[in-house]
Amino acid sequence: MFSVIKNDKHSNARVGFLNLPHGRVDTPCFMPVGTLGAMKGLKHSVLEKLKCNLMLANTYHLYLRPGIKTIEKYGGLHNFTTWNKNFLTDSGGFQVFSLSSLRKIDLKGVRFKSHLDGSYHYFTPEGVFAMQEIFGSDIIMPLDICSSYGIDYNEANLYTNITTNWARSTFKAYKNRKEGYNGLLFLITQGNFFKDLRKRSINDILELDSPGIAIGGISVGEPREKYLEILEYSSLLMPKEKPRYVMGIGTPHYILDAIYHGIDIFDCVNPARIARHGSLLTDNGIMRISRKEYKDDTSQVEKNCGCTLCTRYSRGYLRHLIKSKELFGIILASEHNIYYMFRLISKIRTAILNDNFLNFRTSYLKKYEEENFDE
């Protein structure tokens, strides 16, 4: 299922691959986020051209719209979307728990209020697994509690215990999955920013021996040094033979940090989100195309990029589209940023294979260390 081809000599970075039901996925792997089964503003053909073999979709959003019954009538998420590569489906736990006042947690699940129409719903670990089984997801993520940075120890302990119990329920459902379903379950470790809780969570999850393992609940607003502390601590406790996934990271410097510590898979909406505000990823840092200096700039955004924007249009034209709030500008910028992320991952793989990852990381971080990805 998972094989490591090369371990970097100077870090825990590694190159490998996952064999999934809809094809091989090379690692390290950046997953584009297609919340509702598609990336905002991008055709599947763009991702296919990039040889993207794994996309993330979200169970919470698909449950609310179009609904499980609709997707079931189509024979699953792949048929519904016509995406013939792999889907990892998130449980929707992060979205549910982001609702704060609109949800209520108990030991068996979570009751929440739809952000669409105000109707009430109840998610259980078993129910969330069953939905993803209907989707035909290639990687299933369990219902968990992603707790906020800054909560006290007692609250973090409670949420960690609930997450572990839900993982056990999900794993039981996975062991009793429908005949013929061959998707993989990646269980999620939690523990907030308390090392003893992290250690206990990881040990409890490892006892279940799921095919893959994820680190949840980091990159949730904490200082970068706390992110790095828990990332390093958690990764060192994880077995090397399992694929590792850090949920919700997608900025270049966070990805480089994760790969350095042996993480194989990551996802984030950030590249597409910042594109909608006119921020473009380049080898020299972020280009904020709305700035006046680009008004009459006839050059391309970046050389050696094969996206539609860089092969046809100028910086000045893109600035005009973004300033005018034209949808076409957002589409061009989004495609560029996704192209950039895939080129970056390709360069990282090459660096690891050549035992040059540390030099690559050091050089790259000089350009991106101080960037503000929220602009």
From Swiss-Prot:
Region (RNA binding): 248-254, 272-276
Cofactor detail note: Binds 1 zinc ion per subunit.
Catalysed reaction equations from the record: 7-aminomethyl-7-carbaguanine + guanosine(34) in tRNA = 7-aminomethyl-7-carbaguanosine(34) in tRNA + guanine
Keyword terms of this UniProt record: Glycosyltransferase, Metal-binding, Queuosine biosynthesis, Transferase, tRNA processing, Zinc
InterPro entries attached to this UniProt entry: ArchSynthase1/Queuine_TRR, TGT, TGT-like_sf, tRNA_ribo_trans-like
Pfam families xref list: TGT (PF01702)
A single GO molecular function term of this UniProt record: tRNA-guanosine(34) queuine transglycosylase activity
Broad enzyme group: transferase
Keyword Transferase appears in the UniProt entry: yes
Pathway given in the UniProt record: tRNA modification; tRNA-queuosine biosynthesis
GO cellular component: cytosol
Cofactor: Zn(2+)
A single GO BP: tRNA-guanine transglycosylation
EC number: 2.4.2.29
Binding site for Zn(2+): C305, C307, C310, H336
Binding site for substrate: D90, S91, G92, G93, F94, D144, Q190, G217
Catalytic residues as annotated in Swiss-Prot or TrEMBL: D90 (proton acceptor), D267 (nucleophile)
Task performed by this protein: Catalyzes the base-exchange of a guanine (G) residue with the queuine precursor 7-aminomethyl-7-deazaguanine (PreQ1) at position 34 (anticodon wobble position) in tRNAs with GU(N) anticodons (tRNA-Asp, -Asn, -His and -Tyr). Catalysis occurs through a double-displacement mechanism. The nucleophile active site attacks the C1' of nucleotide 34 to detach the guanine base from the RNA, forming a covalent enzyme-RNA intermediate. The proton acceptor active site deprotonates the incoming PreQ1, allowing a nucleophilic attack on the C1' of the ribose to form the product.
Protein family per UniProt: Belongs to the queuine tRNA-ribosyltransferase family.
Subunit annotation: Homodimer. Within each dimer, one monomer is responsible for RNA recognition and catalysis, while the other monomer binds to the replacement base PreQ1.
PANTHER family cross-referenced by the UniProt entry: QUEUINE TRNA-RIBOSYLTRANSFERASE (PTHR46499:SF1)
The protein, known as: Queuine tRNA-ribosyltransferase
Originating organism: Borrelia garinii subsp. bavariensis (strain ATCC BAA-2496 / DSM 23469 / PBi)
Encoding gene per record: tgt
